[in-house]
Amino acid sequence: MKRLLISATAALALVFAAPAVFAAAPKQGGAATITFNNDLTTLDPQVGYDWQNWSVIKSIFDGLMDYKPGTTELEPDLAESYTVSDDGLSYTFKLRDGVKFHNGRAMTSADVKYSFERAVNPATQSPGGGYFGMIAGYDEVAGGKATTLSGIETPDDKTVVFKLTRPDATFLHLMAINFGYIVPKEEVEKAGADWGKKPVGTGAFKFVEWVPGQNIKLERNKDYHRAGVPYLDNITFEFGQDPTVAVLRLKKGEIDIVGDGVPPAQFTEIMADHANKDLIAEGDQLHTGYVTMNVTQPPFDNLKVRQAVNMAINKDRIVRLINNRAVPASQALPPAMPGYNSANKGYAYDPEAAKKLLAEAGTGEITTELYAMNVDPNPRIAQSIQQDLAAVGIKAEIRSLAQAEVISAGGAGKAPMIWSGGMAWIADFPDPANFYYGILGCAGAVDGGWNWSRYCNKELDARAGNADAMVKDDEKSVRIGQWKAIFDDVLKDAPWAPIFNEKRFTYHSARLGGDPTLFTDPIHIPVNYDYIFAKDAQ
């Protein structure tokens, strides 16, 4: 998942906890207002691939699977139950009774089949269609040779069977991401090109209106299949609100959530104010900020040079630059991700050892370029890295550019080094596989890809494939152990210098209630609107 980071924007926060437990009894009724600086681009679940779009999409639509509120624990959603064949090549879902689209029509298995075919169809231009590449018939549909997936069968209105071409341990997670959310064909076709602005789903909230540049309004779905929720009657998302102005409005009681997060310039002040103690929710993110090194170009085709860069960078100082809103990273995986190796401390900050490695590398004087996004604090972070590299004898010129230009250079394989801030990867779902293939595997080391280091270790790719073929419950711990070993070996090859793992902070009004985990929910980002409530509801 590509997201803006290091500007307190929302992201996936992983909470290995029990489902949310409320300090006060939830109440039915009331409303909430959330502000964002920028307008949304689409509410089409098969197309939206941005945290801000997701924040609304996830309350309008549902998938076959979801996660328990405030956690990363999978559970059936539109599916009532599921079974998996012994070979891991067949998944059978029984659909929940009584599920209706917001237009009043009952959802059936035909809607499930249509929704996945729509995601894969190249005409939809879904950025997530490729996630379903293991479903039989994918190549034909994605290649424009067919419009139906042969691997999805609907024996009756309440049963959906997925036939896979290979076992994939991440498949149930894929049933919970927005690209697989269920949509009604007749509404998609009726809206045509405007479907992304006239959404109809099965979710907790119904779409009311979208005034571009101003607001989006939702109302409670009284026929929602989860009894008792949502609690709020109405939600309004206001756009064009600078986060610093939004903070002032929140203090005046005019809004309820600063959607873009705590502004960096006000972070220390807000966190130090005791009055905000119960109004700031803090959570981890499935995020790592890193420096890529293009391993196909000198001098970074030399392992010792890459290891020296890892040892040269003072991560603690960089964390202080962003007001301690992160923790130093030791490896590619963030601490909250399954497969993270707490025993692996990574490369310690050691400039003298870095100098020794550079001498052993025999590359002579090194002059290179460090690309970085030109939005604060990324230029300051890049300057800190530049100073550290200079101290060990590496001269790095900073190329401070717009996000699109940095992404273009990385995808073209032209950038020797890239600081990922503002473009870093946040997992689409809580599994180590999602932190590998696109950004460290051979599949991403192509023109237009997100593996900007161009690191391609075919042995590790094969091991990753073997790990993901382990789909049985009693193989889970073995699989995660294999992924842990894969990422340990990635660290040895040092295509990245992991810098930090950012945390998420959500600032909300005192009138909103709900467990703190709901305000940094790992899936319904930035907040799980389906389960928070208004304390002053009448």
Enumerate the predicted regions with their spans:
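Surface-exposed binding/hinge segments that line
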Residues: K94, K113, T124-K185
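Gly/Pro-rich hinge or "lid" segments in bacterial periplasmic/extracellular proteins
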Residues: K68-P69, A146-L149, K163-P230, N234, ...
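Aromatic- and charge-enriched surface segment that lines or borders ligand/interaction sites
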Residues: E80-G128, V161, R249, P299
